[in-house]
Amino acid sequence: MNLRITSSEIIKPSSPTPQNLKSYRLSIVDQLTPNVYFSIILLYTKTTENPTKTSDHLKKSLSETLTRYYPLAGQLKYDQLIVDCNDQGVPFVEADVSNHMSELLKLPNIDVLEQLLPFKPHEGFNAERSNVTVQVNYFGCGGMAIGLCFKHKVLDATTAAFFVKNWGVIARGAGEIKDVIYDQASLFPARDLSFLSKSVDEEFLKAESETKRFVFDGSAIASMREKFTHLGRRPTRFEVVSAVILGALISAAKESEEPPERLDTIISVNLRQRMVPPFPEHCLGNIISGGLIYWPLEKKLDHGSLAEEIHQSIKKVDDQFARKFYGEAEFLNLPRLGANEVVKKREFWVTSWCKTPLHQSDFGWGKPKWAGNSMRLNEITVLFDTSDGEGIEAWVGLPKKDMARFEQDATIVAYTSPNPTIL
């Protein structure tokens, strides 16, 4: 792709942050979140005829959005576990792309997609980088790609999706944005964790891993939900897609040179609506926990049973669970955070961006043709809604030797399309 950076500047909040809001405390959930970045890429096939007008429009509305999300324009102080809300702003990079966007949409390629980002998230963590960095890419055909990188320590995927959606709301003048700051640090205060020896900062982002895109369309998911009904309960879209992915991973692990005894899976769960009273759905921070599944490889693989285990693991993550796990620090009892286990296991993560408002990011020229990311992952899958809301797009990151087995799994072959066109 022929891309040329044309400008770079800092966008600051349109109004100064009041003195009494200058310090934003991190919660224990933020504290436990790895020092990594995640990204969002939005592709628009047509915007306006005037790039200069579009640029000014985006900068002005971003500035106003940062006034609501003022910690994102601040500086993370690791030693104090706070964000200094000093209004330092966020970098805003612009680039011209001579290629036609149809080339990108025809065959999505992670190496090409990551050029649309202000930096490559997998190339290491830099504590000095801003909490958010934006790159707007103008295609000669009139299309546009907005790429954003976020510091995960400060926010989760739900926050990021609402941030981009609300940026669009402000850009369109389509309504007021509710208060996004919620003091979860009072409920889940940060702690001294210096005694923990294991770091997961680079656990998900390793050079020897390979990330590939698999799409389950709506009809395939409907078929799977019928086929994998268990004890009369029809699994959800998320449950059945996760079960098929984990099933393929289990099968691949059995064929590996040194197969583990057990697959441990962590299912990322949004806590906002599970708390009592519920947190605002759009509030800032890492407000997530994990459902846990332990699957011995000697156990017979049944996708219906696996989907049911996923369902039950998520069901357990409620208000009481969160208050004990984080508020009373029960997470310290997890073997993966310290003590050695006799069991030879493999860990895998499933995180879902489904039902987030990513596809509602409209800046005045319509919703995106495609919304997703270009993360290079390891032992993790990230799920997104397809643009029609019926299918699910899975980005799966595995060691290369395991990816070859995974993508040849009969169920994956039967129900997915590997990296299909977006056109």
UniProtKB/Swiss-Prot annotation:
Its EC number is 2.1.1.-. Keywords: Acyltransferase, Transferase. Mainly expressed in petioles. The keyword Transferase applies. InterPro entries: CAT-like_dom_sf. The active site is at H152 (proton acceptor), D362 (proton acceptor). One of its GO terms (molecular function) is acyltransferase activity. Coiled coil: none annotated. Pfam families: Transferase. It is an enzyme of class 2 (transferase). It catalyses: isomeliandiol + acetyl-CoA = 21-O-acetyl-isomeliandiol + CoA. Pathway: Secondary metabolite biosynthesis; terpenoid biosynthesis. Transmembrane segments: none annotated. It comes from the Eukaryota. Acetyltransferase involved in the biosynthesis of limonoids triterpene natural products such as azadirachtin, an antifeedant widely used as bioinsecticide, and possessing many medicinal applications including anti-tumoral, anti-malarial, anti-rheumatic, antibacterial, anti-inflammatory, anti-pyretic and diuretic effects. Catalyzes the formation of 21-O-acetyl-isomeliandiol from isomeliandiol. Monomer. Belongs to the plant acyltransferase family. This is Limonoid 21-O-acetyltransferse. It comes from Melia azedarach.
